[in-house]
Amino acid sequence: MDQYIGKMLDNRYEILERIGTGGMAIVYKAKCHRLNRLVAIKILKSDLAQNEEFRRRFNAESQAVAQLSHPNIVSVYDVSRGGDMEYIVMELIDGITLKQYMEKRGQLNWRESLHFITQIMRGLSHAHSRGIIHRDIKPQNIMVLRDGSVKVADFGIACLADSAQTLTQEALGSVHYISPEQARGDRPDARSDIYSSGVVLYAMLTGRLPFEGESAVSVAIQHLSSIPLAPREINPDIPEQLELICMKAMAPDLEHRYQSADAMIADLEAFRKNPEVEMKFDLSDLRPEENDEPTRTIRT
C-alpha cells in the first residue's frame, strides 16, 4: 500500500488517493480539512527530497509560483514548510491532460487548436510578466477541463527540471518540445516557452510531432539543425495564416521568433477575428544560418 495514503500533512491535508506519477513527483488527491475542499498535492520524490540544495530551490520556486493567479494557470494554494517531505498543494482539476486529450482525439481541427493555444499563451503571458518562465511546456503539463478551458500546470516543478534531467530516454517526453537554446544548454527565457508552445500547436494541428528520433539526443539535435515539414503539407485544411503563426513561434533563431507571449496572442486574436487577415512572415526566416538548402517561402 502507498505509504502516504491516509496520512495527514501539517494537521491539515488528508491524503486520499494517488492520481498521477511523474519523473520528479507523485500527485495525490487530498482533502483540506481547514477549508473543507479537495485539492491535489504533488510530493517530491524521496531521492530528490534528500538533496538539500534541491529542496531549497524547490521551496523557493514553489513560493514564487504561488503568487501567480490566472484562469489559465493551475493555482498553487500552499507549499510545505520543512519536515521530512517537500510538497505543493494545488487546485484539483476536473479534466485530463492535453496529451491524453490528443491521444483520444488524434489530429485536432484548427478552430479547437486555436482555442487551446490562445489560452495557453494567456497563461504564459501572465507568468512571464511576473518573471516566471515555465521551461517545460508540453501537452503533459497542460490540463483540459470539461468546459473546454485549459490550464498550464507544473510551473514549480518545471523550473527545477534543468538540474535534475539530462537528455536521456527518460527525457524524451520533454525533448520533443524543447527549444533550440535549451538543447544547446543555454539559459532559457520567455521565448523558449513560446517555441515549445509552437510545437504544441504544431502537434495539435497535424497530429504529429515536428521531429522524431530513437533517442532524446537525436531529437534535440533536430531542433538545432532541422526545419520541420510545414503543417499544411500534412493537413491542407489548416489556414495558411495559422500555419505562419505556428512556424514563427517555432523559429530556431530567437530574433525571428515572437518576442513575447503578448505578441503571439495579438496575431492569434487577429486571425480569430478575421481568418483572412494577412500575417507577414517568411519561412526563410526559420532556416538556421548554417543550413544552405534552398529556401521555401510562403506568402499570404
Predicted regions and their residues:
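Protein kinase glycine-rich loop
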Residues: 16-22, 27
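Conserved short submotifs of the Hanks-type protein kinase catalytic core
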Residues: 83-97, 101
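Activation segment signature within eukaryotic-like protein kinase domains
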Residues: 116-117
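C-terminal lobe helix-coil module of Hanks-type protein kinase domains
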Residues: 143, 174-279
